[in-house]
Amino acid sequence: MSYPGYPPTGYPPFPGYPPTGQESSFPPPGQYPYPSGFPPMGGGAYPPAPSSGYPGAGGYPAPGGYPAPGGYPGAPQPGGAPSYPGGQGFGAPPGGAGFPGYPQPPTQSYGGGPAQVPLPGGFPGGAMPSQYPGGQSPYPSQPAPMTQGTHGTIRPAANFDAMRDAEVLRKAMKGFGTDEQAIIDVVANRSNDQRQKIKAAFKTMYGKDLIKDLKSELSGNMEELILALFMPSTYYDAWSLRNAMKGAGTQERVLIEILCTRTNQEIREIVRCYQSEFGRDLEKDIRSDTSGHFERLLVSMCQGNRDENQNVNHQLAQEDAQRLYQAGEGRLGTDESCFNMILATRSFPQLKATMEAYSRMANRDLLNSVSREFSGNVESGLKTILQCALNRPAFFAERLYYSMKGAGTDDSTLVRIVVTRSEIDLVQIKQMFSQMYQKTLGTMIASDTSGDYRKLLLAIVGQ
């Protein structure tokens, strides 16, 4: 179903709610078992995905004597690197090709404020996607956050009472006018799992659909943000993918952002939800909406079969670096399948080690090589994977920055990232944002948005 008065890109029906009398643009929901059907997306890191039976990274045993993942510093940029913000536990660069004058990155502790460093200049010579002016990407290198503790800005509320919260929301919407601040106080301080319980309690207590009531009281970006917060996390990702491919045109950046950054478990749940709620096969929709090497990359991603072993095989990293060089810079033309195979199957810590090995061996950065060998959406997809291997919070910080930079605001991207990362790593995203752009995320949101929409966004990011 669709909600009355909502624009064409409006949200589809939430599972378990009756029709409103308006024809849906999607197949009827399959009553996906939310919220109990999936583990709640609590604060902190993603839950570990169960073993998929997918072979380990190349089948090589981990050699003994190597430090744990993250023990190596990020690969320096050839020709003199900018002073990137450092991650925890990083010391001097290892030996190898050698980069004279490469500075030791300052120590950054997540417990304190961001390190005061100059604005990075991005990857020399590496053309970023077209939305990055001048091809510059202020991208720091640090250990992949999957190996560190990450924290959301929203935690489950203590002494939670779904019926009490439902009553507060009912009073906020009853009579003339709407008490938006009361709605913000509840919604911004409850976890997604708790919001699902409030939604169920509201229907039990009042025999009414909370989402319909909220839609009748809200509009515009505030409505979009509230609806996103009340969607179960997996359903929101599945809906975002469906919305990116339905109708004329395809929002490739949304497909890349979701499929190239989620864990195996999350991707498998998204695939099941997509089928159950929309009656469609995600892989088939990807094949019909994309083509070429970009299609192959996304199909690889939606299998949810990436190796998630956190131990790094440094021998394999050296061999993969050699394979990637020979598939790209070391030959005429490009062996795209080699890039796809390695970047779609290796764990993120393993890819980070491969990037370091590539830099020492080839005396150039792998991200730059991808820019030289690829273009368009497949370039963006491959670089997203590598950027997440280097520093996942920095990738999302960059996406947030460019959603607000310049004239106008990409509110859909702003809402999607703030909502989906709010219980996972938004604390680290805020810290990287400050380091990369010399301003806080809250400051930029406050200057780029207004009204209750701004108040709710700032409440979520913890300003």
Curated annotation (Swiss-Prot):
GO cellular component, one term: vesicle membrane
Annexin repeats: 160-231, 232-303, 315-387, 391-462
MF annotations from Gene Ontology: calcium ion binding; calcium-dependent phospholipid binding; phosphatidylserine binding
Protein encoded by which gene: ANXA7
Bias kind Pro residues: ranges: 1-18, 26-38
Keywords recorded for this protein, A-Z: Acetylation, Annexin, Calcium, Calcium/phospholipid-binding, Repeat
Entry text on domains: A pair of annexin repeats may form one binding site for calcium and phospholipid.
Subunit annotation: Interacts with PDCD6.
PROSITE patterns recorded: ANNEXIN_1, ANNEXIN_2
Biased composition regions of type Gly residues, renumbered to the chain: 86-99
Its job: Calcium/phospholipid-binding protein which promotes membrane fusion and is involved in exocytosis.
Family: Belongs to the annexin family.
Record SUPFAM superfamilies: Annexin
Repeat-rich region: region residues: 1-140
Annotated organism of origin: Bos taurus
Pfam families, alphabetized: Annexin (PF00191)
Ranges for region 3 X 5 AA tandem repeats of G-Y-P-P-X: 5-20
Name by which UniProt lists this protein: Annexin A7
Positions of modified residues (N6-acetyllysine): 208
Renumbered residue ranges of the record's region Disordered: 1-54, 71-153
